[in-house]
Design a protein with these regions (language model features):
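Acidic, divalent-metal-binding catalytic cores of TOPRIM
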Residues: 1-298
Length: 298
């Protein structure tokens, strides 16, 4: 991808500049789709069930945009990309990494002048556009399709090695049961029993793709990211209500993950002790080391 400057000289374009071009073309596509169909399709990013071959729903321009977005996030990614199950997980991780920045210079840097901290990892956040172009909205079911097509999609870029790992971070509870069964089936180098898979720190699946589960609790009990906050944090009140991490909590007496992430974790991040997150962050560092050994710089 090259650009012509005002003086007529050519230069290599950046990924951000190329993404801007794609976004502009897609904006026109979106407008034309609505106009052509007389508003019969007012929502541009409608997702239909095409299974693994989700690109069937895309036109040629959209397929090119999808291919670019996949490369940018999952093959030519300039930083480690971390995929999580829910929209609250990136909040937890960002706050934990920021709080523990002295222990994890590989994951965050502090700007000298402003003292602002900038993450060195990409905590992938889903939205309607990514759902449409990448078939990702978060959750173990999405990632079951993701890992099954990852190797095939990466073949389009294999003339150059991947730049960084892509990590699927999942709660170690009942949610990813089908995901675990599928990776056992598809990757012969993994343990053959689900309970053994759950005990591992992390697994390399293929190419630059890894899976990382939250560590099991004592007694090999299931865990989720919320379990790595101290009890006193989990017991903090919001508007007189208690935190309940279940999806079916009683909103009249309790509050859920969204408010916990926003009003408890984010607002108290400077005083919360995030040290229980260290095993997870340590595994991310180990994954990076493993990746470098597989793909040493030339």
């Amino acid at each position: 991808y090259t650009l012509i400057e005002k003086d007529g000289k050519h230069r290599k374009g950046t990924l951000s500049e190329l993404e801007g071009r794609f976004a502009f073309i897609d904006m026109l596509d979106k407008y034309n789709n609505v106009e052509a169909k007389k508003n019969a399709r007012p929502e541009r990013y409608v997702v239909k069930g095409f299974g693994l071959d989700f690109k069937q729903r895309l036109n040629s321009r959209e397929k090119a945009y999808s291919k670019f977005l996949y490369y940018k996030n999952f093959y030519g990614n300039e930083q480690i990309t971390i995929l999580t199950e829910g929209k609250t997980d990136p909040v937890y991780l960002k706050c934990a990494i920021d709080s523990l920045f002295l222990d994890y210079p590989q994951l965050v840097r502090e700007e000298k002048n402003t003292k602002n901290r900038v993450l060195k990892v990409n905590l992938f956040k889903t939205n309607d556009k990514k759902k449409y172009f990448l078939d990702l909205s978060g959750g173990a079911a999405d990632y079951s399709r993701f890992f099954r097509r990852h190797g095939l999609l990466c073949k389009a870029y294999e003339k150059q090695p991947p730049k960084n790992p892509v990590i699927i971070l999942l709660d170690n509870d009942t949610g990813p049961s089908d995901f675990i069964n599928q990776i056992i089936k598809d990757y012969s180098h993994l343990p053959k029993k689900a309970e053994d898979v759950r005990k591992g720190a992390f697994y390399h699946l293929e190419s630059n793709l890894y899976v990382l589960f939250t560590p099991l609790l004592p007694g090999d009990n299931y865990s989720s990211l919320e379990d790595f906050f101290e009890p006193k944090v989990l017991q903090m009140k919001y508007n007189g209500k208690s935190f309940d991490k279940s999806n079916n909590h009683d909103s009249s007496t309790t509050f859920g993950k969204d408010r916990f992430a926003t009003y408890i974790v984010r607002e108290n991040r400077k005083t919360i002790d995030f040290s229980l997150f260290k095993p997870i962050l340590d595994s991310i560092i180990e994954i990076k080391k493993h990746f470098i050994n597989l793909h040493p710089s030339k």
